[in-house]
Amino acid sequence: MLLNHATSSIAGLNESIVAGVIDQRIRDAYVTILSAVTEICKGHLGHPVPIVIHGYDYPVPDGRGFWGGGLFPGPWLEPGFRRKGYTQMGKRKQICVKLIDRFNTMLEGLAGNPPFEHVKFLNLRNTLLTDATYKTWWENELHPTPKGFQAVTKKFAAII
């Protein structure tokens, strides 16, 4: 849905779908939640409380899922890339960077601007490495290792 086929004349992200999903639907969901929390706090405390919102780091879509199962054990990203003809890891990572940047830009645009002056944006991009050592930072396609969580935790501690 978000991704055109690699052999298509319009390969890469489907801009109109990405805009509709991130810039409209997901943004609207964040506005709804932030507005509700803000109004509840104003009603009960007389003022909004500080809120931290955060995006994601750049994942490595290598097909590693969550060991131990669960409802959604993964892999989450690699199968979609494979079905759409993206076999090269470099191209997959480039597409993930564009998508994650778009999501983070949307969040950053909400934080600190009316009516969300009390909302701070935490940028987690480039916290976890995606180079040859990425498996020491990423447990799977979406979740950090303990070492990765320590790096993320330091960023949260700094903003709180």
Regions found by a protein language model. Give the residues of each.
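Oxyanion-hole/transition-state-stabilizing segment in secreted/luminal serine hydrolases
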Residues: 1-22, 57-66
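Substrate-gating cap/lid alpha-helix
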Residues: 62-120
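Hydrophobic, aromatic-enriched interface-forming segments
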Residues: 24-78
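Acidic carboxylate-rich catalytic motifs and surrounding loops in phosphoryl-/glycosyl-chemistry enzymes
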Residues: 117-134
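Well-ordered, non-membrane alpha-helical segments in soluble/globular domains
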Residues: 12-38, 93-107
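Histidine-centered active-site loop/cap adjacent to the catalytic His
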Residues: 136-160
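Short glycine/proline-rich turn/loop motifs
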Residues: 86-88, 132-137
